[in-house]
Amino acid sequence: MSDYKHTLNLPETEFPMRGNLAQREPKMLQDWTNKALYHKIRAAKKGKTPFILHDGPPYANGDIHIGHAVNKILKDVIVKSKTLSDFDSPYVPGWDCHGLPIELMVEKKVGKPGKKVTAAEFRQKCRDYAEKQINGQKADFIRLGVLGEWDKPYRTMDFSSEANIIRELGNVVRSGHLEKGFKPVHWCTDCGSALAEAEVEYQDKVSPSIDVRFNIADEASFTKQFTAIGEGLGEGTISVVIWTTTPWTLPANRAVSLHPELEYSLVQVQSENGNERLVVATDLLDECVKRFGFENTHVLGTALGQALENMQVQHPFYDFTVPLILGEHVTTDSGTGCVHTAPGHGVEDFNVGRQYNLEVANPVGANGVYLENTPIFAGEHVFKANEHVVEVLAERGALVHHVKYTHSYPHCWRHKTPLIFRATPQWFISMDKNGLRAASIKEIHKTQWIPEWGESRIESMVAGRPDWCISRQRTWGVPIALFVHKDTGDLHPNTDALIEQVAQRVESEGIQAWWDIDPQEMLGDDADTFVKVLDTLDVWFDSGVSHYFVVDKRDDIPASADLYLEGSDQHRGWFMSSLMTSVATKGHAPYKQVLTHGFTVDGKGKKMSKSLGNTVAPQQVTNKLGADILRLWVASTDYRSEIAVSDEILKRSADAYRRIRNTSRFLLANLTGFNPKTDLVPFEEMVELDKWAVSRAHTMQREIVKAYEAYDLLVVTQKLMQFCSIEMGSFYLDIIKDRQYTAKSDSHARRSCQSALYHIVEALVRWMAPITSFTAQEIWQEMPWQEDEFVFTGTWYTGLTAQADNTEFNDAFWQQVLAVKDEVNRTIELARKEGTIGGSLEAEVKIYATAELAELLSKLQDEARFVFITSSATVEAVESKPADATETEVPGLWLHISASEGKKCARCWHHREDVGTNESHPELCQRCVTNVDGEGETRAYA
């Protein structure tokens, strides 16, 4: 038996079947670094239309987690896709470096500043710690295949950044949005500092729920305001009843608030105190009576809240009276409709108190302990004092009702401990003084939010948020570099110039310069009347002004930011702080689009935590499976909602990756010996099936690029998989194997096929590049005709051609053929299982079809057998179908499979009756004889 293997065009490539990504990727990264890939991209795109994705800085503390990996991969995919769309899209990664978490880590090592180390030494230790953390995180981000300005990132602790943060503070001052105030702020007693809105988490907390009597001081005057119902206005002490879940704030009570338009009822009740009269909102009366457990109650009279304004009530345990005041914040959602008001412990209380010039009492220290001059409760921690307050109320007959109550309560994001509202002298960016709130909302509406619900979410947050407290009482932070008058607290009249002088010092010496500056040196004679502010800036201000010191200031960023991309928690964090500072100083939003992704959860949808043991470390995934698997997983998810990850989910991504890799390998292996400069067949001269494949790639590229532009990576990966697995793997590539392997090596039939494969791999490698970056570059290196060294420096492939819809062999034609082929495959598989045939090349298929379908399939003529991968395929009228023909799911199509009576060709394995008709090649069919010794077969259709 002769060996015809040498006459076949067998696939050949050095591109391995197995990715071995964990071993191969680090070597590729080293090569990219050595060859300055990122800077080559920048050079290639210089002068192109800019697209700026501004990086929200991760915090420089700890190893990166899977959420960090998702965020950085998404950004990298988008930047690379924009680069392929021929934008100049630099990526400057950043880090957030100041603040409490780093202070706490350094405190563990060296103690608090001022004890074992000076404040200056402590700041340097913090800087050193952040530097080390950044280096670790940077290595992990680079390992993910993220390209960027890694040798020159932005860091909020860089001297230039610190200086520009101070300059932007000066711009806020100049725009008139900065205020100093004694206001209630979220305060963490563990941090000993105010917290920003973004640093507050809400968790369930069990608190005392109490209703408390405030006795009326002048009952005669009070009852005159009520319209009687029936005879008289009853008997017994009169009390206004308030409801609260923060008994510890009662020492600071300075009023009871009523709603001016609400009706209040004077109610006769019998209690443990005997006959008494209580005042509650009429709308809440039934609920209150039920809660209090009183019997024999009836309404004596009613009055509007506005009629009771300025009436005095007795504080429940201190020897002074407080007024009844009016406030629009009072509701009938719960409670009694009479609101305990402590201006030092609540924003609404503070605001309404200011209208009545109430004292802003603040009897609580920074550590959460009542001050020494606080009657009854001095020295007690507020949360421990709750029960003591309840006891005192009960002893004095002021307690109406008391139960335990579970409710959502603000907690410190770092310590996970309950917060208090505490009035302290702080610096604020005013939301309303100069119209910042309204201007910010206007800019929100000009921005594109993806998903769309982000717009209403951040709008409601901005609409309802308090003034932004930007001051902190910390050591490691950018200073609020202001001089204020000792007595009045007013800013120095030369503040603009002073801020610039400080910024210049900080630019060369870092933030320590502020604490080292002698006021005399800068202020001269004014040093006696003006003092330095020693507070530091909220770290959300640091990162929130990165639009100023990164996007506006850096030479390698050519324009304002097009896109911010972070987790959905950043609506109340970085998106908001960036918006407010940009609108305050520049009058517009810092971004054109804002895209958010969800949080990672485990395979069962549960939140990830170390305690549950369900975390997935990106480092372990890259070390085991490779970064491309992680990148493909990220792109394959609907990342705008929760993102599930588990070993099983990653395994599915690895399986999908193998299908893409195998398709790529087939393309490369069958381009051996092909030179596009000499062998490329023009589109119009190609075999019809090859035209279709190129045209499908053209359509697919249009859809994929559109999906990239919409940041819809799930659609990109779905299209990739559809193209590789179905349209190529199960159809086109399956069909062309015979022609590719058996046709004469330089024949038109084979060169047409190779030309299609060439166009397809040129397009496919670029579609893949933003997502499976390492594999795309690996493929690129196996394409010897490429002039560019890297796939990332070019653009989408422009050599694809679309087949016109009005042509005979258009996409609709081939889609119909594909549907018939699926039915043929299914029917052959049934025949194989029944033992009628072995493989498909042993089969003869007779296709019985209705007139229209039969006419369509007949266009393939004798080449239909190559499409169906059978030794024979004939098309006949449906009327002639035999009784044992198989009906299919394609309307009007029946199939009949039988074993071929022809002999098996030793070269192409088709069973043909003409095998052995050539004496020189008795084991070959006539087609193979032509391909071996003759001019080679011709193909027109497949």
Curated annotation (Swiss-Prot):
It is an enzyme of class 6 (ligase). GO terms for cellular component: cytosol. Its EC number is 6.1.1.5. Belongs to the class-I aminoacyl-tRNA synthetase family. IleS type 1 subfamily. Catalyzes the attachment of isoleucine to tRNA(Ile). As IleRS can inadvertently accommodate and process structurally similar amino acids such as valine, to avoid such errors it has two additional distinct tRNA(Ile)-dependent editing activities. One activity is designated as 'pretransfer' editing and involves the hydrolysis of activated Val-AMP. The other activity is designated 'posttransfer' editing and involves deacylation of mischarged Val-tRNA(Ile). Keywords: Aminoacyl-tRNA synthetase, ATP-binding, Cytoplasm, Ligase, Metal-binding, Nucleotide-binding, Protein biosynthesis, Zinc. This is Isoleucine--tRNA ligase. GO terms for biological process: isoleucyl-tRNA aminoacylation. Its cofactor is Zn(2+). It comes from the Bacteria. L-isoleucyl-5'-AMP binds at residue 566. SUPFAM superfamilies: Anticodon-binding domain of a subclass of class I aminoacyl-tRNA synthetases, Nucleotidylyl transferase, ValRS/IleRS/LeuRS editing domain. It catalyses: tRNA(Ile) + L-isoleucine + ATP = L-isoleucyl-tRNA(Ile) + AMP + diphosphate. Binds 1 zinc ion per subunit. Zn(2+) binds at residues 905, 908, 925, 928. GO terms for molecular function: aminoacyl-tRNA deacylase activity; ATP binding; isoleucine-tRNA ligase activity; tRNA binding; zinc ion binding. PROSITE patterns: AA_TRNA_LIGASE_I. It comes from Pseudoalteromonas atlantica (strain T6c / ATCC BAA-1087). A motif ('KMSKS' region) lies at residues 607-611. A motif ('HIGH' region) lies at residues 58-68.
